[in-house]
């Protein structure tokens, strides 16, 4: 969070974030997500190795999402440990439902632009249901880099036309501003 704010204050150059993440805490991840969405600079997110759980949500905030050819992408409901009184557990379960809805909103909004869902002329509701069905099938929905692009979770695989390397991505972004 501090680094994004520092780089934003330093100028309007694109910010390139490299991430390898098997996941993490919901609140901390959403803090990063919010910082990215509020940043005035163009943010490019490059996923390496694994983008799982919260590590697959955070990149959705970026302006450009690139995945490395061998990076794995995974979405799921996450895990929860509940402890406390009956009412506290009920309250926590209700919060989990709200977080799930927020996660589905984020994924559905980006997936609508994916080749798979454009071909199907999908709606927000049908995309949400598709994602729910995939998670219900196996709990964890794993995708390779090409599948992540096809479903709209990422914009391109590094090495694709126009995304040959990080420098070419930087050039594209800089030319957009001219």
Question: Model-found features: residue ranges?
Answer:
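N-terminal organellar transit peptides
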Residues: 1-56, 60-178
């Amino acid at each position: 969070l501090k680094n994004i704010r520092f780089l934003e204050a330093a100028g309007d150059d694109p910010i390139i974030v490299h991430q390898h993440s098997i996941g993490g805490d919901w609140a901390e991840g959403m803090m990063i997500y919010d910082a990215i969405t509020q940043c005035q600079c163009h943010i490019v997110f490059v996923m390496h190795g694994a983008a799982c759980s919260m590590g697959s949500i955070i990149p959705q905030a970026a302006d450009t999402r690139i995945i490395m050819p061998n990076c794995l992408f995974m979405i799921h409901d996450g895990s929860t440990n509940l402890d406390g009184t009956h009412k506290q557990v009920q309250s926590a379960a209700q919060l989990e439902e709200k977080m799930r809805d927020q996660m589905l909103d984020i994924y559905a909004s980006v997936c609508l632009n994916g080749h798979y869902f454009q071909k199907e002329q999908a709606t927000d509701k049908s995309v949400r249901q598709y994602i729910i069905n995939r998670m219900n099938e196996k709990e964890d929905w794993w995708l390779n880099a090409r599948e992540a692009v096809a479903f709209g979770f990422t914009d391109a695989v590094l090495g694709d036309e126009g995304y040959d390397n990080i420098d070419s991505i930087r050039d594209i972004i800089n030319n957009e501003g001219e």
